[in-house]
Amino acid sequence: MKDFSDFFRNPHIWDREIVAVGGDLSPERLLYAYKNGIFPWSDQPILWYCLDPRGIFDLNKLHISKRLKRKINQKRYTITFNRAFEQVMRCCAYRPGEETWITDLFIKSYTEFHKLGYAHSIEVWDENGNLGGGVYGVAIGNFFAGESMFSFISDFGKIGLFHLFEALKKDQFTLFDTQQLNIVTLCLGAYQIPKKEYLRRLESAVASGKKWNPLRTVF
């Protein structure tokens, strides 16, 4: 792996959230960043963050409401992995009237990262074959960073997240990074831990460096 230690501040000792400004979103830089607890946000210029505290999920403690559980059990949908990665990213970026950090540069760069086996999507299709929801993120070793989620059909994004968690647990993932908390992730059970603890857990989770290879359709 290419060494970018001269570009990024060391998050173990740097006490600010922005650890670098500029650079590019090349696969090599993204891989180094995620393995060291760093992620990009915005692209004019690119700002690289390592937040303290850090938002994470416990894979065994996703909060599922009774209403959502009924929808999951009704199975009026089809789940796939990595069938429509770029489409999922574009759907996550589609926020009429709002700004989005998922720009064309991010879409192009993460799609390339996906082709190399590090970025993944989960798609939730309705009974007519329409893409109703999905999630995308980055997987390295036993670590997954959830980047964004969308729902064009009510709760389909949450259904996708539920099945993503099931797949990650099956493959023995140990850390799910949600970066920062928002009202959706809070309601689903995300919580914060100190950066120091996050980096310790991350080091163990990414140690194998293996690529995740989920089946295209597993449910």
UniProtKB/Swiss-Prot annotation:
It catalyses: N-terminal L-lysyl-[protein] + L-leucyl-tRNA(Leu) = N-terminal L-leucyl-L-lysyl-[protein] + tRNA(Leu) + H(+); N-terminal L-arginyl-[protein] + L-leucyl-tRNA(Leu) = N-terminal L-leucyl-L-arginyl-[protein] + tRNA(Leu) + H(+); L-phenylalanyl-tRNA(Phe) + an N-terminal L-alpha-aminoacyl-[protein] = an N-terminal L-phenylalanyl-L-alpha-aminoacyl-[protein] + tRNA(Phe). Keywords: Acyltransferase, Cytoplasm, Transferase. GO terms for cellular component: cytoplasm. GO terms for biological process: protein catabolic process. GO terms for molecular function: leucyl-tRNA--protein transferase activity. The keyword NAD does not apply. It holds the Pfam family Leu_Phe_trans. Its EC number is 2.3.2.6. Signal peptide: none annotated. It is found in: Cytoplasm. Functions in the N-end rule pathway of protein degradation where it conjugates Leu, Phe and, less efficiently, Met from aminoacyl-tRNAs to the N-termini of proteins containing an N-terminal arginine or lysine. Belongs to the L/F-transferase family. This is Leucyl/phenylalanyl-tRNA--protein transferase. It comes from Leptospira borgpetersenii serovar Hardjo-bovis (strain JB197).
